[in-house]
Amino acid sequence: MLRIPVRKALVGLSKSPKGCVRTTATAASNLIEVFVDGQSVMVEPGTTVLQACEKVGMQIPRFCYHERLSVAGNCRMCLVEIEKAPKVVAACAMPVMKGWNILTNSEKSKKAREGVMEFLLANHPLDCPICDQGGECDLQDQSMMFGNDRSRFLEGKRAVEDKNIGPLVKTIMTRCIQCTRCIRFASEIAGVDDLGTTGRGNDMQVGTYIEKMFMSELSGNIIDICPVGALTSKPYAFTARPWETRKTESIDVMDAVGSNIVVSTRTGEVMRILPRMHEDINEEWISDKTRFAYDGLKRQRLTEPMVRNEKGLLTYTSWEDALSRVAGMLQSFQGKDVAAIAGGLVDAEALVALKDLLNRVDSDTLCTEEVFPTAGAGTDLRSNYLLNTTIAGVEEADVVLLVGTNPRFEAPLFNARIRKSWLHNDLKVALIGSPVDLTYTYDHLGDSPKILQDIASGSHPFSQVLKEAKKPMVVLGSSALQRNDGAAILAAVSSIAQKIRMTSGVTGDWKVMNILHRIASQVAALDLGYKPGVEAIRKNPPKVLFLLGADGGCITRQDLPKDCFIIYQGHHGDVGAPIADVILPGAAYTEKSATYVNTEGRAQQTKVAVTPPGLAREDWKIIRALSEIAGMTLPYDTLDQVRNRLEEVSPNLVRYDDIEGANYFQQANELSKLVNQQLLADPLVPPQLTIKDFYMTDSISRASQTMAKCVKAVTEGAQAVEEPSIC
């Protein structure tokens, strides 16, 4: 296994000028012709035998090879014969040469695979009936297709002690075939060197050397890439077989990236969550919170409507009674006496329905929990609050300036993209804010926001780096905008971005200014005209307050008049429900077909995987029923009609998996000059500094026992490091 600096040096060597490289390609096409089982195929120079075979649809068996990891070539399962070559070659590691005829199904190739498979199975235990990998195991499939029908191994099989690497990944290391996929993933994708090998030959083992937790926010992905049952999910252990589950394609709402997922369910219960391929967002990875927090969907759920009685206690009631009480209050108060706050997990359909309902009572006090400055361009220009370069676009950047953010825990898949570009494209990264572990090296410019002024004026040394960059990115974390000087920070970043565009070699299509959001609902709420932050409610306390999934604790009972009537609509009894006078149980993201917009402005849909528990209903349906009882019926009855209304208000919300370019950067910069606010000297400190802060950030993950175990394991691990044993 090559260390990262060595690998980066080798990558640099591979980028030699073409004049210094001897090639067999023709000058006209730069492609070379090879043959796969007699079938001609044209490929790029440097293409491996395995890639050439896949190009014509020929599948080569493999265990260690993975297209997103470096080539190890140590399982030897991909051995194929090259015509006139003395020996078989490893298809994953051997570059093709002009005129080669690759024989994938020759007797020599088959014999080689059978021999490799026999060696792999010699020490492999017969655990298939009790192995969680059963039914989706590469070793099972390939031994059936390419292996022999009997073994000649008569000696005793070896046994390996299992490793404890945390509460998420279960290890049965006797099943390990030493493909090193997990080691390469940890080192290359996750940026953590916790995993490695010890011993050699028959005594070789994969582990952490000393017993410790695999400290990564992406650790669950080693379960997916493990070709055997050596690494499986601890929470999922012995619960279901893959052929028993129903799979629903959906998206994740634990952060603002919008990772694509597959929800596996059985008998109306979420059994597990797996990643779904999307090259422009999450590739084929997901974060541990996305993967393992699903048990929070079953705990602390609101399943029936509740009202507060004369004694001040919340008691169960019927939908008719609960909606009638709320309708009565909406009929009694109008205008500024009615307000609403939308939480971080709310879908666009519910947001537009609530907006229409409050507009019927002449109120426009619709707020989000997350603050975004309204001074200057504010939220009037969409480019002002999006990740304009896009998530995949970071792979084209040559310089990234991070401001007040820790993307490793606020947006793990975006951070993985930055690491990927840093590793393969020599990306230069700089950070303004508290020093954090980002899994890649960066220049720490300091933690004071006043550094932004120095960069904007050109007096800071990093100004020259940005000026010389061809595709620079400035990424401002939304957490930095929660400060009292958020408007000044946004104006300073906007000024830097515009000056870079004017003075460097940035082309017209490249976008410099980027906002990295943390919560799933924020972009859709801003698109629909919600006011960011609850300052308007604090200044003018309402008589009726509607909390739509608002569990961030941005407002408390003490902030409101004693006679304020609070309605909470959501799916968990978390922060908002205990202060409410009426509770309306809603549906979680796995229980409804809903629209969410990620930080880059891409609209995506969740799908119904299970039905809501008890009497809970979809949020927009509750609001629609409430409007009818209150005598102000909203003009839609079906989901399609709600989405037609979404299209009227903001057409981009129904253009799924599409990103609309936003280019009003110059106008935003001109308006930012009108901001009359000074930068504070307080350091920029992101709320999620360590992995302990990553696991429990919303109502679902806070209800998850698995996430609580992670916090406990990380805390105990940190204490063990701080307080070493006397022995």
Swiss-Prot record:
SUPFAM superfamilies: 2Fe-2S ferredoxin-like (SSF54292), 4Fe-4S ferredoxins (SSF54862), Formate dehydrogenase/DMSO reductase, domains 1-3 (SSF53706). Keywords: 2Fe-2S, 4Fe-4S, Acetylation, Disease variant, Electron transport, Iron, Iron-sulfur, Membrane, Metal-binding, Mitochondrion, Mitochondrion inner membrane, NAD, Oxidoreductase, Primary mitochondrial disease, Respiratory chain, Transit peptide, Translocase, Transport, Ubiquinone. Its cofactor is [2Fe-2S] cluster; [4Fe-4S] cluster. One of its GO terms (cellular component) is mitochondrial inner membrane. [2Fe-2S] cluster binds at C64, C75, C78, C92. Binds 1 [2Fe-2S] cluster per subunit. One of its GO terms (molecular function) is NADH dehydrogenase (ubiquinone) activity. Residues 1-23 form a transit peptide. One of its GO terms (biological process) is mitochondrial electron transport, NADH to ubiquinone. The modification N6-acetyllysine is found at K84, K467, K499, K709. [4Fe-4S] cluster 2 binds at C176, C179, C182, C226. Its main location: mitochondrion. Its EC number is 7.1.1.2. It catalyses: a ubiquinone + NADH + 5 H(+)(in) = a ubiquinol + NAD(+) + 4 H(+)(out). It is linked to Mitochondrial complex I deficiency, nuclear type 5: A form of mitochondrial complex I deficiency, the most common biochemical signature of mitochondrial disorders, a group of highly heterogeneous conditions characterized by defective oxidative phosphorylation, which collectively affects 1 in 5-10000 live births. Clinical disorders have variable severity, ranging from lethal neonatal disease to adult-onset neurodegenerative disorders. Belongs to the complex I 75 kDa subunit family. Core subunit of the mitochondrial membrane respiratory chain NADH dehydrogenase (Complex I) which catalyzes electron transfer from NADH through the respiratory chain, using ubiquinone as an electron acceptor. Essential for catalysing the entry and efficient transfer of electrons within complex I. Plays a key role in the assembly and stability of complex I and participates in the association of complex I with ubiquinol-cytochrome reductase complex (Complex III) to form supercomplexes. This is NADH-ubiquinone oxidoreductase 75 kDa subunit, mitochondrial. It comes from Homo sapiens (Human).
